[in-house]
Amino acid sequence: METRYLFPSDYMADPSVHVFGNRLYIYPSHDRETGAAFDDDGGHFQMRDYHVLSLSGNPLEAEVTDHGVILDVDQVPWAEKQMWDNDVVEKNGRYYLIFSAKDYNGVFHLGVAVSERPEGPFIPQEHPIRGSFSIDPCVFKDDDGEIYCYFGGLWGGQLQWYRPGPTPKPSLEGRGEVGSEPAVSLGPAPDKVTDLLCPADAPALPSFVVRMSDDVLQFAEAPRPVIIVDEKGEPLKAGDPHRFFEASWMHKANGRYYFSYSTGDSHLLCLAVGDNPYGPFRFKCELLQPVVGWTTHHSIVRYEGRWWLFHHDCVPSNDITHLRSLKVMPLDDKLFE
């Protein structure tokens, strides 16, 4: 399978990729070396700004343009550090960058910055999105124009601080059956316990999805859990190597919704499929085997008549896990038939 390192002159990761006009835009996080200690909370991932890259033509061959810094942590009034993953969506000719960063209390939230152009620069809102938490936003625009944000990441991403509230048993039919009750108690658990030892036979902690407001600046509803189920329709367990850990991505093909994600400490990218944006999503397959480096994070896009997987690894940095490099590879169309 052909692959390519997209931007070998700098360390970037966590690519969110979209086609605006006839050009493909890549919104990565921007890795840097700070000497911070390695830990399970990701303290060594000290990113402070975002760039945008773009190309036109075959991603395996086309020249990649770096449009420079589009947002720096010093521009964001509420954020102190760790500008982790981000994504961009277009609505009515404006571009909305949704990003994750830590506030001055050490808590991750999602923020929004706005631009008139896909290459930025982006102007941040003064405050984070009300009720937002954790990391790794993916912003998906459905065919009817509704915009959804998928988010969440365990361990350093703090998702384990939050617990879903009572929801109906997952059903593979009908958009309205899942998440009809408030799905999360907003705000960190009082003791902020990092439960890294969830029993293997307990349901896996889910990511979340929320519909965005018409102005794309706030949540329009309470976040709902994204439930991934097995072939019997049962939620995946915490001990399943295919359960969710971080790095949500959503795309649509042939009328179906494909939720892909990283499994974290089992180091896989996996694919699940559902019939509506809220899920549940039935586990389908592994997309990518473990790469060099601890994390694996991606996006999937159709461009130039093919499906492409954008991701990262740590081969160029000799396996320094917080210095990652962007890659691209084609995917088989049969995955989404």
Named regions from a protein language model:
Residues 1-337:
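Carbohydrate-active catalytic/glycan-binding domains of CAZyme proteins
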